[in-house]
Amino acid sequence: MHLSAVFNALLVSVLAAVLWKHVRLREHAATLEEELALGRQATEPAPALRIDYPKALQILMEGGTHMVCTGRTHTDRICRFKWLCYSNEAEEFIFFHGNTSVMLPNLGSRRFQPALLDLSTVEDHNTQYFNFVELPAAALRFMPKPVFVPDVALIANRFNPDNLMHVFHDDLLPLFYTLRQFPGLAHEARLFFMEGWGEGAHFDLYKLLSPKQPLLRAQLKTLGRLLCFSHAFVGLSKITTWYQYGFVQPQGPKANILVSGNEIRQFARFMTEKLNVSHTGVPLGEEYILVFSRTQNRLILNEAELLLALAQEFQMKTVTVSLEDHAFADVVRLVSNASMLVSMHGAQLVTTLFLPRGATVVELFPYAVNPDHYTPYKTLAMLPGMDLQYVAWRNMMPENTVTHPERPWDQGGITHLDRAEQARILQSREVPRHLCCRNPEWLFRIYQDTKVDIPSLIQTIRRVVKGRPGPRKQKWTVGLYPGKVREARCQASVHGASEARLTVSWQIPWNLKYLKVREVKYEVWLQEQGENTYVPYILALQNHTFTENIKPFTTYLVWVRCIFNKILLGPFADVLVCNT
């Protein structure tokens, strides 16, 4: 009898444990269903989010998937889908062909050369490609029952969610502007991250971009074996990126940067508002220099001495901040009011985008690391409209560096290399240009600790910062371009058999009367018809008589454009055909 009682007790315990686990799994699934707004989330009105399941299934089975993309190649393409599906078992997206399916562009096998599009903003990286498999809609009869996602989805990859530079440059900025590229998307979309990473150290920043909780690929498995998106955008705009990381050629600024400080600062303003960081600035006399303190590697060994020297030189207090010890909102608050930001090279310097106009960025580089070869933060600071001063300082003294050859290879260790290679690296005075991402000499040098030579640092800063550093009230510096000159005309006169004159005149661009422009000039190109070369002229007036090399009874082509402040070149007006 006792044995039976014990057995029954054990059986009850096991059943209770199984039931408890089942209940917890059901609770987890229910939570995710709520996150998908399946009609039960108070902040997202149920009528707008519920899916009429029978109708949705009928549309999918009869009509199939619908896709229309923008962009000519996989590196600049964003696609808009209706009824795109995802198999959690196969970990593949599915395009179901039905009676009303549309696939534009219809690439055929070119869709695999190499992919339909990039899921991240790191261009043409073979781990970031997006594609789908194709099935007839009739195959749905033999597949798991689809779960329909009612949210408008923005589907993308995060490239490296544990690195703050990658988070801002590759993800947050592109997400912010992709959401604003399509009407209503910023207020309706839910972000789906498909790269397979966990949340990462900065997931809270992604949550600021949309009123709906982002979802990761791993979370989708709990929702069903087959998910179908009623409306989805796939891919990210790369238009805000300014740097390439060296996968094909050594790292450096992108060849064709399309973003300015204006767009960066609008994004920064959005982020500071979401983080509840004020824009009031600091009172007069309370200005400060902010020094980023690192706690694990790439240390400033004489940090206290550096703080004192900066305070004495610039007659303002110095403050330290670190990503490890401060909430990110506090970091942004300190950066956004700083007169100068000083930091070793590292991801924390992407916070430069929060600096006020007129502030100074001072980037410190360890021994043997050439600042000209690693410029993501210089490129950011020097974007037109950022209005920042940038200073790079490099440790030139090997005795002021502390190396760590015994560390793991990914933290700069080199003991895994043969002795000859170790000796070469130790004797090298500069890391050669290299590709990303495992160059042992680069890792060895970038993870060094540095004793900053303070006199040389102050001297380097003073070459750029002549007076007291700090934010300044500046007029809007984004250049406005002239329109076309108007009413261009020409008049010719002939004097004898070998002499002629050609007078060209025009009216100012119509937008000039609404602008305050420091200097206005005009560029005129003069070309004899049939010749391959032209003669350019820069003129201050709105008319000019040309006599040099003007031939009688000859046809000339004339182009005229306006130039503001020597660098803002307007468009050429329509070509003038002038006969002498």
From Swiss-Prot:
Molecular function per GO: acetylglucosaminyltransferase activity; protein O-acetylglucosaminyltransferase activity
PROSITE patterns: FN3
SUPFAM superfamilies in the cross-refs: Fibronectin type III
EC top class named in words: transferase
Lumenal side: 26-580
Keyword Repressor: no
Protein family membership: Belongs to the glycosyltransferase 61 family.
UniProt protein name: Protein O-linked-mannose beta-1,4-N-acetylglucosaminyltransferase 2
Gene name linked to the record: POMGNT2
